[in-house]
Design a protein with these regions (language model features):
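Charged phosphate-binding loop/patch that engages nucleotide di/tri-phosphates or the phosphate backbone
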Residues: 109-128
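Conserved RecA-like P-loop NTPase helicase motor core
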Residues: 22-111
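A structural preference for short, hydrophobic beta-strand core positions in alpha/beta folds
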Residues: 20-23, 121
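Short, structured coil segments at secondary-structure junctions
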Residues: 17, 53-54, 115
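Conserved strand-helix element at the start of the C-terminal RecA-like helicase core
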Residues: 1-12
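Conserved helix-turn-beta segment of the N-terminal RecA-like "Helicase ATP-binding" lobe
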Residues: 11-19
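Repeat-unit-sized solenoid/scaffold elements
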Residues: 7-9, 80-86, 127-128
């Protein structure tokens, strides 16, 4: 949600005050997005037709099952012309205790197979 984007951006900014960390939603100026080291946004606000030059990492916190929505989120990442040795990364969270999360993860693995260089699953021993 828009409100949660603000809360997360404020929290991250308190942890890393030397970085430009901002919320970016549809009511915000596009320059906010471009000038941020870290931008916290919604899928809708930073979705279709929003170009984010130099985007290195996209972290999706929503459990999303839609093939179109997932492809759209993955599609935010582009080849980094200014950093040829860096490969952009698309990260997403899965709760193994929620069956729908597992189902959505399995769909991503299948749907992304021809769109990504690799797909790794990392398991943490704690819940967020």
């Amino acid at each position: 949600s828009v409100q949660l984007c603000g809360i997360i951006a404020e929290h991250l900014a308190s942890k890393w005050p030397s970085l430009a960390i901002n919320r970016y939603v549809s009511e915000d100026n596009y320059e906010v997005l471009l000038s941020s080291d870290i931008a916290v946004s919604t899928l809708k606000s930073a979705g279709t037709a929003v170009d984010i030059p130099g985007l290195m990492i996209c972290l999706m916190t929503d459990a999303l099952g839609s093939k179109q929505g997932n492809s759209q989120a993955l599609g935010r990442l582009r080849v980094l012309k200014d950093w040829p040795g860096i490969t952009p990364e698309f990260l997403y969270l899965v709760c193994r205790d929620i069956p729908k999360h597992i189902e959505y993860h399995e769909r991503k693995v299948e749907n992304f197979s021809d769109k990504v260089l690799s797909h790794k699953t990392l398991t943490m021993n704690y819940r967020l």
